[in-house]
């Protein structure tokens, strides 16, 4: 700080005389645009900017001394003839101008150090560079090159406008249209301290000009902050969609073969938000069990957003058991446009004497788990699902559609097990422990989705589980756990001696047929 203060004091003593001479001779001519043609092409705007900045600084009450000097390697004599002070005694400033690529950063670091000294000391040195240009053309004022007025405001307005354009969409900050000189003079006047500004106007390096002019606005190098905010805004832009999905939908365990489809943009909105026309798009899975006398257990648990996981434990002591639930949807169940669509699941049973168990558990968004303990020792029970939609069931565009589920029975006298458990959005289900030891026992499970369920906008996201393939020596138990007691689950097995015979039953809700 002390070398800077001594340097500024020495320059103040020298430059007061120069500013007085320039104020008497060149100030009045610089203010008039008609008379500004008497100056050379690169110097008239510089002296005018010096006069404007000096008057603005003196009106604020700060004892600032302005001096504008061009630095050109080819024309030092002409600058001295135009009564402008050539500060070649400042070694670092003039040497840094001859090497714009390497020394511009070091000079900006000087400016940052001097700007940091503003908050502690009283004296301020702000040096602004414009690099490039030749003496005969004198294209040192960028405002004149673009046809603007010859005032020094044009320089700073141009730079401030170029700073506004990239920063306005990213940062959203309001930047006033006051030029950089006026803002700098306002800052110097508010502190009421001697401010030395040596402006080195050599153009064609406007990105460096912007970097060196940014410390005029804020004391602690806002250019770094603004560029960090630019980068942070650019980084945050592609993450918005993923973060909004995680904020809206929570962290979801997706066990799927096609995670790109299940994590698509058509995510369902939770917590009672209405999401019409949103489809979860359960990826169409073609399922083929293992050949050659194996027990293929395929579990596709399409789970809702807040649904619990199903545990399917299948104990098959019989050779050919089939259990299938039917749905009874009752009393004004509004499932308008709920998106638990399972699109086109094609199911093919095993070909060579296998026991194929396929289970599709479509769960709703807030559905609890069902627990069906089925111990089947009968040999040939076969049931098929029946759906009863009752009493004002508004199933307009329900997305619990199992669209095009193609089911093909086995080819060689086998009987496959296909269980499609379509679970409602807020349905609770009881536990039924059914031990079937006779050979001719028929049970069929039906689910009752009760009245007043308003499932608009509640959507079901389905995740495909990987299929567990059990060997022919293993035994499986089919168990789906739930904790509710609203729905009555009735399981019904029907005996059929033909492998391809499936008898459809229209069941009442509370009937157990044997």
Swiss-Prot record:
Basic and acidic residues bias (residue ranges): 50-59, 72-84, 243-255, 285-302, 404-422, 451-483
UniProt keyword terms in alphabetical order: Repeat, Secreted, Signal
Main localization (coarse): secreted
InterPro entries with a match to the protein in the record: Semenogelin
BP GO terms, sorted: coagulation; negative regulation of flagellated sperm motility; sperm capacitation
Matches recorded under Pfam families: Semenogelin
Record's compositionally biased regions (Polar residues): 34-49, 138-160, 177-196, 206-226, 379-389, 440-450
Protein's cellular compartments: Secreted
Signal peptide span: 1-23
Domain of life per record: Eukaryota
Region annotation (Disordered) ranges: 24-118, 133-491
Any one annotated GO CC term: extracellular exosome
Family membership: Belongs to the semenogelin family.
Assembly behavior: Interacts with SERPINA5.
Protein function: Participates in the formation of a gel matrix (sperm coagulum) entrapping the accessory gland secretions and ejaculated spermatozoa.
Official protein name in the record: Semenogelin-2
Species assigned in the record: Ateles geoffroyi
């Amino acid at each position: 700080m002390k070398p800077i203060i001594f340097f500024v004091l020495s320059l103040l003593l020298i430059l007061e005389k120069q500013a007085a001479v320039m104020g008497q001779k060149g100030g009045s001519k610089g203010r008039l645009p008609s008379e500004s043609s008497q100056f050379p092409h690169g110097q008239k705007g510089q002296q005018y900017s010096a006069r404007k900045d000096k008057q603005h600084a003196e009106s604020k009450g700060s004892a600032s001394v302005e001096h504008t000097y061009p630095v050109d390697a080819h024309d030092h004599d002409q600058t001295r003839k135009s009564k402008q002070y050539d500060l070649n005694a400042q070694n670092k400033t003039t040497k840094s101008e001859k090497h714009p690529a390497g020394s511009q950063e070091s000079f900006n670091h000087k400016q940052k150090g001097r700007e940091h000294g503003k908050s502690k000391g009283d004296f301020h040195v702000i040096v602004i560079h414009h690099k490039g240009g030749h003496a005969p053309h004198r294209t040192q004022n960028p405002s004149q090159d673009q046809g603007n007025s010859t005032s020094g405001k044009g320089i700073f307005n141009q730079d401030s406008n170029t700073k506004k354009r990239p920063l306005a969409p990213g940062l959203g900050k309001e930047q006033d249209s006051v030029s950089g000189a006026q803002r700098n003079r306002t800052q110097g006047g508010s502190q009421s301290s001697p401010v030395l500004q040596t402006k080195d106007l050599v153009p064609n390096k406007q990105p460096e000009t912007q970097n060196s002019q940014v410390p005029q606005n804020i004391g602690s190098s806002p250019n770094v902050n603004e560029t960090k905010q630019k980068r942070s805004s650019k980084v945050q832009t592609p993450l918005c969609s993923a973060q909004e999905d995680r904020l809206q939908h929570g962290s979801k365990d997706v066990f799927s073969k096609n995670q790109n489809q299940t994590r698509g943009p058509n995510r369902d909105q939770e917590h009672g938000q209405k999401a019409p026309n949103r489809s979860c798009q359960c990826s169409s899975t073609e399922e083929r069990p293992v050949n050659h006398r194996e027990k293929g257990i395929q579990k596709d648990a399409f789970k809702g957003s807040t649904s619990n996981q199903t545990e399917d434990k299948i104990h098959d002591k019989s050779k050919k058991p089939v259990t299938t639930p039917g749905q009874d949807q009752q009393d004004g169940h509004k499932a308008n446009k709920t998106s638990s669509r399972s699109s086109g699941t094609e199911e093919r049973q095993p070909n060579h004497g296998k026991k194929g168990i396929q289970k599709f558990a479509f769960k709703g968004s807030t559905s609890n788990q069902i627990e069906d303990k089925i111990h089947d020792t009968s040999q040939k029970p076969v049931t098929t699902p029946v759906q009863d939609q009752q009493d004002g069931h508004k199933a307009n565009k329900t997305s619990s559609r199992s669209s095009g589920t193609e089911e093909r029975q086995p080819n060689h006298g086998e009987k496959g097990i296909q269980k499609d458990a379509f679970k409602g959005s807020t349905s609770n289900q009881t536990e039924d422990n059914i031990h079937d030891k006779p050979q001719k026992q028929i049970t069929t499970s039906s689910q009752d989705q009760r009245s007043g369920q308003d499932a608009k906008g509640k959507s079901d996201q389905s995740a495909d589980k990987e299929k567990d393939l059990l060997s022919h020596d293993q035994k499986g138990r089919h168990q789906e756990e739930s904790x509710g007691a609203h729905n009555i689950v009735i399981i019904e097995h029907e005996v059929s001696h033909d492998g391809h015979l499936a008898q459809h039953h229209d069941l009442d809700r509370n009937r157990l047929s044997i």
